[in-house]
């Protein structure tokens, strides 16, 4: 899945650059500039749909990648694992600021709700929120800085990816038995290159089908309405890939408690290398650990479903 994530990143940067050429980061023009891209730019509709659904593929791949890492004990490469978790956090930040850019209803209210969470931080919270907003509400300054961040972060992700790979190359990669594989090393090309191409095909087919046939399947219809600070949507919810965390946030009545639980649901990944107590690295021959792992997966799926 690592190679797929690399392809996702490249695709997102290319489509994103093409979209940035036609986008205007201004509250009065953002929504119409996106509509203009879809209507009047050559293949603008395709570029936008690939960019929007490419984000979904990115998250599918990264969640599978993390799940695989948990299952096979890859977290024992501590540096690789920690840079990976930082990559996940950066990706989440990028997806969040990007979702705000079309300046539809859900963009605006999503930005309002999520940035507002920082006000739960004792003493300095309110100051941080107003500083992030650039005013007393989500407005033009917020949009322009979010565009700047959304442009910058993917390049930070690219840099972190190189760090991630550098650390991985220190140890070499893991395998399903969790045993040294020095004697099984084979040339990257043609073996791994062909294997990776199979993966790209398997990912590109659903992505293309999604972008061509039902590009709005995963989006929120509210976002077809231009942002209006005076009208709150009935159900404010993020894109599907954040629903598990959003469900955790909403299930706790206390604001600070919810924010801490939300943060913990992702940051817990940093602790995993310290929680490994088994003599075996992978879960291949550990049925009880497997049971716990699949309960975790089911739990996340249920949270995602409940969150919507």
Curated annotation (Swiss-Prot):
Which residue ranges run through the membrane? 1-21, 45-66, 81-101, 146-166, 194-214, 256-276, 288-308
Q: Give the GO molecular function terms.
A: metal ion binding; ubiquinol-cytochrome-c reductase activity
| Residues bound to heme b b562 | 51, 150
The compartments listed are:
Mitochondrion inner membrane
Any GO CC annotation of this UniProt entry: mitochondrial inner membrane
Keywords attached to this Swiss-Prot or TrEMBL record, sorted alphabetically, are: Electron transport, Heme, Iron, Membrane, Metal-binding, Mitochondrion, Mitochondrion inner membrane, Respiratory chain, Transmembrane, Transmembrane helix, Transport, Ubiquinone
Could you say which residues bind heme b b566 here?
65, 164
Signal peptide segment: none
Task: Respond yes or no to whether keyword Transmembrane helix is given for this record.
Answer: yes
Q: What does this protein need as cofactor?
A: heme b
| Annotated InterPro entries | Cyt_b/b6_C (IPR005798), Cyt_b/b6_C_sf (IPR036150), Cyt_b/b6_N (IPR005797), Cytb/b6-like_sf (IPR027387), Cytochrome_b_C_euk/bac (IPR048260), Cytochrome_b_N_euk/bac (IPR048259), Di-haem_cyt_TM (IPR016174)
GO aspect biological process, one term: mitochondrial electron transport, ubiquinol to cytochrome c
Q: SUPFAM superfamilies, from UniProt?
A: a domain/subunit of cytochrome bc1 complex (Ubiquinol-cytochrome c reductase), Transmembrane di-heme cytochromes
Any note on cofactor binding?
Binds 2 heme b groups non-covalently.
Membrane topology term: Multi-pass membrane protein
The UniProt record gives the binding positions of a ubiquinone as 169
Further remark = Heme 1 (or BL or b562) is low-potential and absorbs at about 562 nm, and heme 2 (or BH or b566) is high-potential and absorbs at about 566 nm.
Q: What does this protein do?
A: Component of the ubiquinol-cytochrome c reductase complex (complex III or cytochrome b-c1 complex) that is part of the mitochondrial respiratory chain. The b-c1 complex mediates electron transfer from ubiquinol to cytochrome c. Contributes to the generation of a proton gradient across the mitochondrial membrane that is then used for ATP synthesis.
The record's subunit annotation is:
The cytochrome bc1 complex contains 11 subunits: 3 respiratory subunits (MT-CYB, CYC1 and UQCRFS1), 2 core proteins (UQCRC1 and UQCRC2) and 6 low-molecular weight proteins (UQCRH/QCR6, UQCRB/QCR7, UQCRQ/QCR8, UQCR10/QCR9, UQCR11/QCR10 and a cleavage product of UQCRFS1). This cytochrome bc1 complex then forms a dimer.
The entry's family comment says:
Belongs to the cytochrome b family.
Please identify the protein, giving its name as recorded: Cytochrome b
Organism (species): Scytalopus magellanicus
Q: What is the lineage of its organism?
A: Eukaryota, Metazoa, Chordata, Craniata, Vertebrata
């Amino acid at each position: 899945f690592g190679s797929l994530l690399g392809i996702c990143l490249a695709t997102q940067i290319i489509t994103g650059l093409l979209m940035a050429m036609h986008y205007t980061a201004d509250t009065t023009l953002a929504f119409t500039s996106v509509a203009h891209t879809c209507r009047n730019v050559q293949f603008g509709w395709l570029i936008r749909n690939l960019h929007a659904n490419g984000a979904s593929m990115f998250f599918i791949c990264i969640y599978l990648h993390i799940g695989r890492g948990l299952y096979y004990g890859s977290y024992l490469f501590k540096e690789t694992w920690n840079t990976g978790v930082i990559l996940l956090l950066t990706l989440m930040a990028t997806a969040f600021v990007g979702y705000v850019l079309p300046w539809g209803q859900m963009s605006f209210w999503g930005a309002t709700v999520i940035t507002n969470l920082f006000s739960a931080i004792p003493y300095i919270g309110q100051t941080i929120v107003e500083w992030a907003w650039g005013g007393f509400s989500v407005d033009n300054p917020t949009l322009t800085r979010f565009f700047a961040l959304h442009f910058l972060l993917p390049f930070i992700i690219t840099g972190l990816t190189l760090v991630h790979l550098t650390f991985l190359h220190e140890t070499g990669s893991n395998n399903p038995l969790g045993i040294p594989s020095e004697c099984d090393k084979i040339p990257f090309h043609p073996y791994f290159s062909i294997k990776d191409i199979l993966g790209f095909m398997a990912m590109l087919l659903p992505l293309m089908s999604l972008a061509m046939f039902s590009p709005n399947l995963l989006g929120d219809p509210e976002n077809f309405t231009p942002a209006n600070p005076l009208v709150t949507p009935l159900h404010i919810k993020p894109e599907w890939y954040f629903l598990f965390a959003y469900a955790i946030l909403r299930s706790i009545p206390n604001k600070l408690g919810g924010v801490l639980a939300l943060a913990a649901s992702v940051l817990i990944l940093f602790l995993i290398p310290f929680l490994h107590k088994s003599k075996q690295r992978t879960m291949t021959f550990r049925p009880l650990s497997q049971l716990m792992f699949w309960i975790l997966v089911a739990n996340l799926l249920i949270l995602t479903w409940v969150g919507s």
